[in-house]
Amino acid sequence: IVSMAMNGVSEGESHSNPHINETCCAYNLLKLTKDLNCFNPDDARYMDYYERTLYNQIIGSLHPEHYQTTYQYAVGLNASKPWGNETPQSTCCGGTGSENHVKYQEATYFVSDNTLWVALYMPTTLHWEEKNITLQQECLWPAKSSTIKVTAGEARFAMKLRVPYWATDGFDVKLNGISIATHYQPCSYAVIPTRQWKENDIVEITMPFTKHIDYGPDKLPAEIASKDGHQLETAWVGTLMHGPFAMTATDITNWTEATLNIDSRLASITVVEPNGPQTGTTGNLYTLMQGGRTFQ
């Protein structure tokens, strides 16, 4: 279930645990997704998938303190990440693992003759050579808001900004301080029609993270849920999500402990905001609290 929620890929690769992800598979599917998006950039499902895989598996495959990456990315009860690949020659995931973490920005923008698509929200600078215009995007990662500013040049084009599938409440786009719409459809693109862009034009995007449950496509069989000796019935299971992030608790060891008593509005889940405006492995991190359990 967690594997599907984070868009993990693989099934028993290298005769290992059958429910484990391979970093190289995610890497290759992101390349495919980026190319498919070029053929149909108005379909936000491609970049929703891309964002979720990038943020959960790819970024999660890098050791937070020193250079190590994952080959197989274990998820589930009592799982831990098998770090390795200190040199790129160790495995295929060592080579692609080195590449993964220097190209987060490569699918942020897409362009046609007269349209700019903003597909991801992260600190980046775009120089559109054909239009001779430069735009700078500023935000903290993970981004609940972002600002895009024209820093040099003038050009005429339309701008389309992705409304993530999880942005179901409070999403807004402002152009020079004025909202461009009163309603935004999740998993779509908000459109600023063709106009003359000039230096100091500013686009502000607000996208509060929303709590939701990403349910599996079928029920968890009772025989699997009861393997640890706790007798449970066949039931629907899902992953607790905060925006695009699959949240995990580090102290759950069996399916009984993983059972949460929540209502359909998720009102019992409390969001703990980050302590300070930081980007990195220890900053700008969100925590969810429910029934005495902590999810990060």
Where in the sequence are the language-model features?
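Well-ordered alpha-helical segments within folded domains of soluble proteins
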Residues: P18-N37, G94-Y104, F209
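Short beta-strand/loop motifs in extracellular/secreted proteins, especially
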Residues: F157-M159, D169-F171, F245
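C-terminal beta-strand-rich structural cap/linker in extracellular carbohydrate-active enzymes
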Residues: F157-K160, I192-T210
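C-terminal beta-rich recognition modules with glycine/proline-rich loops and embedded aromatic residues
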Residues: M47-N56, S61-K149, Q185, T206-Q296
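Structural helix-adjacent loops and short alpha-helical linkers that scaffold large soluble proteins
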Residues: L36-D48
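Surface-exposed beta-strand/loop patches in extracellular or lumenal glycoproteins
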Residues: K149, A155-Y165
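Solvent-exposed beta-strand/loop surfaces of large extracellular or lumenal domains
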Residues: T168-P193, I213-P221
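Solvent-exposed loop and edge beta-strand segments that line ligand/cofactor-binding
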Residues: I1-Y27, G84-T96
